[in-house]
């Protein structure tokens, strides 16, 4: 996916599942690019929020949200009295990633504007921009022909 908005790129990287070749979540790789102390604290928090259950598959601890939530519910159903099998504990990393995305969105007005539009509005905007590009192409073609004469 090619996103031109920097904040949307960051959100996209945070929400991506674990990169299997690096054996660490893309969210951590994205956070390593930031230099502020606040982001380093968030990375430490994210690391501390990972489930400590060794029987959890590695893809579910940092992977996509839905499989992670279903696995957490399965663990709770399997052993409801185990303190480490609480939904809050097992889904802590998901909540943290979503809060991080929410804060990124709330801090940037351009991102709010982009995300506030409906798909039908985007179709209209895309169509309008395609028309503008076609007009610009036509003008450039006319200029090129005039230069060739």
Curated annotation (Swiss-Prot):
CDD domains named among the record's database cross-references: Med9-C
Other information: Present with 1364 molecules/cell in log phase SD medium.
One term under GO cellular component: core mediator complex
Quaternary data: Component of the Mediator complex, which is composed of at least 21 subunits that form three structurally distinct submodules. The Mediator head module contains MED6, MED8, MED11, SRB4/MED17, SRB5/MED18, ROX3/MED19, SRB2/MED20 and SRB6/MED22, the middle module contains MED1, MED4, NUT1/MED5, MED7, CSE2/MED9, NUT2/MED10, SRB7/MED21 and SOH1/MED31, and the tail module contains MED2, PGD1/MED3, RGR1/MED14, GAL11/MED15 and SIN4/MED16. The head and the middle modules interact directly with RNA polymerase II, whereas the elongated tail module interacts with gene-specific regulatory proteins.
Source organism of this protein record: Saccharomyces cerevisiae (strain ATCC 204508 / S288c)
Biased composition (Polar residues): 46-63
Broad class of the protein's primary localization: nucleus
Protein name: Mediator of RNA polymerase II transcription subunit 9
């Amino acid at each position: 996916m090619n996103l031109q908005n920097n904040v949307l790129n960051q959100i996209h990287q945070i929400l991506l599942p674990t990169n299997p070749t690096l054996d660490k979540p893309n969210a951590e790789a994205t956070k390593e690019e930031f230099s502020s102390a606040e982001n380093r604290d968030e990375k430490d928090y994210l690391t501390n929020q990972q489930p400590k259950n060794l029987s959890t598959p590695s893809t579910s601890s940092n992977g996509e949200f839905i499989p992670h939530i279903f696995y957490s519910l399965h663990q709770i159903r399997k052993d409801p009295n185990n303190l480490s099998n609480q939904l809050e504990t097992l889904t802590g990393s998901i909540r943290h990633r979503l809060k991080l995305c929410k804060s990124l969105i709330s801090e940037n007005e351009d991102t709010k504007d982009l995300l506030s539009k409906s798909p039908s509005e985007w179709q209209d905007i895309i169509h309008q921009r395609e028309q503008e590009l076609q007009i610009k192409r036509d003008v450039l073609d006319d200029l090129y022909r005039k230069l060739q004469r």
